[in-house]
Amino acid sequence: MSQLTETQYHQLVDDILLQIEQKLEEIEDDLDIDYENFGGKLDIEFADRSKIILNKQEPLLQLWVATKFNGYHFSYQDGKWIDERFGDEFWHFIEEAVEKQAGTKVKFSD
């Protein structure tokens, strides 16, 4: 179980969503990607009309991600967001998921 406070949780997830949104803003002219962030939920739509949806699950202190392939639940562990089922680290996962759906590699983290 996460040791985050609700305040820490919201700050961490808001930072992730902002970082993704800023990167999408940089590349939106090069790739046919639309996105919208509203109330802790970020929808990303690709040229093929598929989507990735990221949203807060505050009661569980998790970040949930839905792709056209599956749903993923990330919990904060040892300074990283880790998927409960597959053990993937969030930034590695989201870069692969976007590449699969956009057809182009996108680097979100440093």
Residue ranges and their predicted role:
Residues 2-110:
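N-terminal intrinsically disordered, cationic/polar leader segments
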